[in-house]
Amino acid sequence: MTKIDKILSKILIDPYDQTPLTTTANDEGDIISVESQNGKSYPVINGVIDFEGGGNYADNFGDQWTRFPKLQLDSFNGTTISRDRFLGALKLSSSELRGKLIFDVGCGTGRFAEIALESGAFVIGLDYSSAAYVAAKNLKRYKNFRAIRGDIYKLPFKKHSFDLVYCLGVLQHTPDVERAFKSLPPVVKHSGSLTVDYYWKRFRSLLGWKYIIRLITSKLKEQTTLKILRVV
């Protein structure tokens, strides 16, 4: 079993009743099954532990990143946009991340996790959408990463598990922002840190074209939106 999976097996709990979970690994050391004490099992698909399945409010994000899986990765687009934003938000140097156990909340396709992994951190990324599967594929070259599909309101981790928890550009997309935020501090170690940011929606900024367009496109079916984009 890889080191990240050994760590994960010690901190995982059932997100619905908070009881410990048992993980089973194959001969290569990869987790292949997760079971609760009450006999409930959760699938492990393409390396992703899936506590959700089915559809949810984040489906559009998952579909978006399935179509454009590497768009935001610095390693793909040749920029340092993700790196600069990530380290700027954390106010840390990359060397300070080495060896830390990090929780990426709303990991998307892994744009920020990639930076942390390159710095030598151990990263667990969680996303409510199918983007978790995209992150697992994008970052499979890293043996210190594990993706989970789960709910920010029902985190599958014991209290005080992580050295660092970050949630960047995610909270404003959740149905209940306050509840989402309050779910994060309990999983941070007493000596750890939590970094959260959000989009500042001043009245003036809401008049921008992208927000006006979003009011329209958010009501359209995905295929309709894509057809419009192709024409434009």
Describe the predicted segments one by one.
Residues 154, 172, 201:
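Active-site micro-motifs of SAM-dependent methyltransferase domains
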Residues 111-113, 174, 202-207:
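Short catalytic/ligand-binding loop motif for oxyanion handling, primarily in non-cytosolic enzymes
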Residues 1-156, 164:
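Conserved N-terminal segment of class I S-adenosyl-L-methionine
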Residues 133, 174-179:
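Short N-terminal helix/helix-N-cap motif within the alpha/beta-hydrolase-1
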Residues 193-225, 231:
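Conserved class I S-adenosyl-L-methionine
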Residues 178-190:
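A short glycine-rich, Lys/Arg-flanked "PGG" loop and its adjoining helix->strand segment in the class I
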Residues 164-175:
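A short SAM/SAH-binding and catalytic strip from SAM-dependent methyltransferases
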